[in-house]
Amino acid sequence: MTPRSRLATLGTVILLVCFCAGAAHSRGDTFQTSSSPTPPGSSSKAPTKPGEEASGPKSVDFYQFRVCSASITGELFRFNLEQTCPDTKDKYHQEGILLVYKKNIVPHIFKVRRYRKIATSVTVYRGLTESAITNKYELPRPVPLYEISHMDSTYQCFSSMKVNVNGVENTFTDRDDVNTTVFLQPVEGLTDNIQRYFSQPVIYAEPGWFPGIYRVRTTVNCEIVDMIARSAEPYNYFVTSLGDTVEVSPFCYNESSCSTTPSNKNGLSVQVVLNHTVVTYSDRGTSPTPQNRIFVETGAYTLSWASESKTTAVCPLALWKTFPRSIQTTHEDSFHFVANEITATFTAPLTPVANFTDTYSCLTSDINTTLNASKAKLASTHVPNGTVQYFHTTGGLYLVWQPMSAINLTHAQGDSGNPTSSPPPSASPMTTSASRRKRRSASTAAAGGGGSTDNLSYTQLQFAYDKLRDGINQVLEELSRAWCREQVRDNLMWYELSKINPTSVMTAIYGRPVSAKFVGDAISVTECINVDQSSVNIHKSLRTNSKDVCYARPLVTFKFLNSSNLFTGQLGARNEIILTNNQVETCKDTCEHYFITRNETLVYKDYAYLRTINTTDISTLNTFIALNLSFIQNIDFKAIELYSSAEKRLASSVFDLETMFREYNYYTHRLAGLREDLDNTIDMNKERFVRDLSEIVADLGGIGKTVVNVASSVVTLCGSLVTGFINFIKHPLGGMLMIIIVIAIILIIFMLSRRTNTIAQAPVKMIYPDVDRRAPPSGGAPTREEIKNILLGMHQLQQEERQKADDLKKSTPSVFQRTANGLRQRLRGYKPLTQSLDISPETGE
C-alpha cells in the first residue's frame, strides 16, 4: 500500500469514527426492542408440552429490562456448611395410634348476671309557650342481696332505692311516687349473648303545670343483664361482654380465695351464697335446682356467676389431631413420630412423661373415648401392643401414644381354622427384622406340625412379604442417605461458586433476577429494579472514541419508571442493565457478537449491528437428565395449622369489642329522643315559630310569602342581636365593661336620689347654699306672712316667664317652615337684608 493510499485509508477511518460518535450523540444508532415479549420459539416452533424442556427462560422476570446494582444494602444470607445426614439404618419402627394435644389458648367463657338500680334525675323547665330539659343526672348503684333473691326468683323489684352520698342518705322513688313492687320486662337487643331486663325503660320528664318554674323528675329503673364473661390464664380476673372488668378469679370459691370481708384490696365486696335459686324468665315462679353462686359488689353494680371447679371447667391442653395410623421410629436419643396425614415429624425424648394422668386429669375421659373409637376402626387389622404412653415434644406438644401390632397372616389363618378360639396374645415389641423372622419361623414350625398344605402356603407368603419389606426399606434408607449426602455436597459447591459470581448463584437459587455480593462472610442479596420497558434503546455500534478500544456489550439508554431523566448503561446478561460502561475489549479485525434480548438475538459483526434473529434458531445444550418417577406417590405438603382462626381470635383478647360497641351504640340510640330534648326545647323554638307562621299565611300567595320573609328576617335579626349581646357579655373585656357600666349607673342613681331628697327637704338652701350664713337685716327679721308673699311672688314670676317662653316658642316657625319660606322667597327673587351694626335689632333705628 502506497503512502498516499494509506493516508486516504486513515482519513476514511477517522471520518467514520467521527461520524459514529456524532451519530451516537444524536441517538441515530439506537433502536427499540418490542415491548410485548413472546415466549421463545413461538414463531418457528410448536409450543413446549408439559414435561419437556423449554428452550428459553421460564420466568417472566428474565424478559424484563432491569437494574440490579442500584441498591447498596440487602438481605443477608449464609450457607449452612455444618449440615449432617441422619443415619436411619437398623431403626425400630412401631405402628400405633397418636393423639396430639396442644396448649389451650382459648379463654374460659362462662355466664354472668349483672344487677343494678339506676336513679335518673331530670330537671324540666316550664315556660309560657315552651318546655325544656335543662339537666339530667344518672346515679347507678348495686342492688342489695335480699332484693337480688327476689329478682332472680320472680323478676320483681322495688321502685325505690336508697343512696348514700357524702354521708347523707337519700331515697329515690320512681315517678316521685310511693315504693311499690314492679315487674322486670325483657328488652330487645342486637346480640344473642346479651339479654337485658328493665323495670322502667321510659324516662320520666313531664314538666310542671305552672309557667316559669322548674321540676325535678325521678326515674328508678331496675336492671338485669345476662351476658357472658371471659377469663384468660392465669384466671385472676375476667371481662364481661359489656366491657366491665372484675379483678376476681372466676374460680375463687373453689380456690378459697374469695374475700368475705365488706371490702378487699380491690375495693370489691365478694360474697358466696350457697343454694341460691336462679330461674329463667319463661320459668319464673318455679323452683329449679339451687346452686352456689359468687356475688361481687362494686360501687355501681353487682355481678354473680355460678361457682365452678377449675379442674373441670378449664383444661390446660386441647386435642389438636388424631392419627389412627402413625409410626414411631426409635433413634439414639429420641422418638420420631410420623403420619401420612401431615408432612411433619414430632420429636420427643425417650423418657415418657410421668404422672400425666394425675396432672391432666381433665383429659382422661377424652383420651379414653378417642382411643376406643380409633381401636374400633382398626380392630380388623391391628390389636393393641402395650399400654398407653405419654411424651412431651420439643415444640411444646403432648403426645398420647398407643402402640398397635398388625394381625399377621398366621393369626388370620388360625382364626379361619378355629373361629371359636380367642385371638393369640400380642407379641412384645421387637428390635430388628432378624428377630421378627426368627420368632415367626419358630411359630411357623410349631403351626406346621399338623402337616397342612395351607400352612406352608401361608408361611411362604409371609416370608416373601418380610423379605420384600426389608429389601424395600433398605433401598429407601440408602436412597435417603445418598440424597442427603448429595445435598450437602451441592451446598458446598454452591458456596464455592458464589465466591466467583455470587449474583448468578443467588439468581439460580431464588429463581428470579437478584443482585448479590459478598459482605465479609455473608452474602447481601437485593431485588432488581424494572425500568420503563418502552424507553430502552440499544446502540447499534460497539465502537468507542478510542480506535483500539471497543465495547464488549452494547450501550443502552433507558428511563426509570415515573422518571423523565435519561440514563446510560450497558446491556448485561439476560436483559440486565449495567449502570457502568467499563466492559470493553481490544478491537479485532473480524468478530461477531450475539446478544439475547427477550425472544430475539441481536447479531453484531465487526462491532456494528447486522441483523436480528430468533433466539430459538440457536441450539441449546441439553444438560438435564430425565428421571421418570411417576410410579412413586407424591406427597403434597400442606400448611399445618396448630390453632384455628377462631381460637386465635378468642385468645387475642378477652375483650369482645364487637359486642361491646354494638350494644353500646344500640343502648345509646335508644335515648336519642331524650338527648335531642337536652339540646333543644320540647314545645316551641324559633324554627318552629317561623314554620307555623308560614303555614298560616300560605294561602295569601305572594303577600303571604313577603310577610313570612319579613317576619323571619325580623326574628332572625332580633335573635342575632340578642346572641351578639350575649356573646359580647361572655367575652372577658365585654363582661368587665358591662360590670363597670352597671356600677356607674348604680352610683348615678344613688347620687340623683340623694339630690332629690335634699331638694325635697330644703329647696331654698339647695338654690342658695349660703343662706344660713347671711346675717339678718338691721330692720329686724321678716315675718312669716312676708316670707310667704315673697315665695308666692317668686312662683308667680317663674310661671309668667315660663308662659312667655312657651308663647314665643309657639309663635316661632319651625325649622321645616323656615326652610320652606326661605326656598319660596329665593324662588321669587328675594334676598335677605344685611343689618348695620349700629342699628338696634329691636327698634330698627
UniProtKB/Swiss-Prot annotation:
Region (Involved in fusion and/or binding to host membrane) residue spans: 124-130, 208-216
Family annotation (InterPro entries): Glycoprot_B_PH1, Glycoprot_B_PH2, Glycoprot_B_PH2_sf, Glycoprotein_B_ecto_C, Herpes_Glycoprot_B
Position of the signal peptide: 1-26
GO BP annotation list: symbiont entry into host cell; virion attachment to host cell
Topological region Virion surface: 27-732
Post-translational modification: A proteolytic cleavage by host furin generates two subunits that remain linked by disulfide bonds.
Membrane topology: Single-pass type I membrane protein
Gene3D superfamilies linked: 1.20.5.1890, 2.30.29.100, 2.30.30.1230, 6.10.250.3280
Biased composition (Polar residues): 811-822
Domain of life: Viruses
Region Disordered, residue ranges: 29-57, 411-451, 802-845
Span(s) of short sequence motif Internalization motif: 830-833
Transmembrane portions of the chain: 733-753
SUPFAM superfamilies recorded: Viral glycoprotein ectodomain-like
Entry keywords, A to Z: Disulfide bond, Glycoprotein, Host cell membrane, Host endosome, Host Golgi apparatus, Host membrane, Host-virus interaction, Membrane, Signal, Transmembrane, Transmembrane helix, Viral attachment to host cell, Viral envelope protein, Virion, Virus entry into host cell
Glycosylation sites (chain numbering): N179, N254, N275, N355, N368, N372, N385, N408, N455, N562, N599, N614, N628
Disulfide bonds: C68-C528, C85-C484, C157-C222, C315-C362, C550-C587
Assembly and interaction partners: Homotrimer; disulfide-linked. Binds to heparan sulfate proteoglycans. Interacts with gH/gL heterodimer. Interacts with host ITGAV-ITGB3; this interaction mediates viral entry.
Record-given protein name: Envelope glycoprotein B
Lineage: Viruses, Duplodnaviria, Heunggongvirae, Peploviricota, Herviviricetes
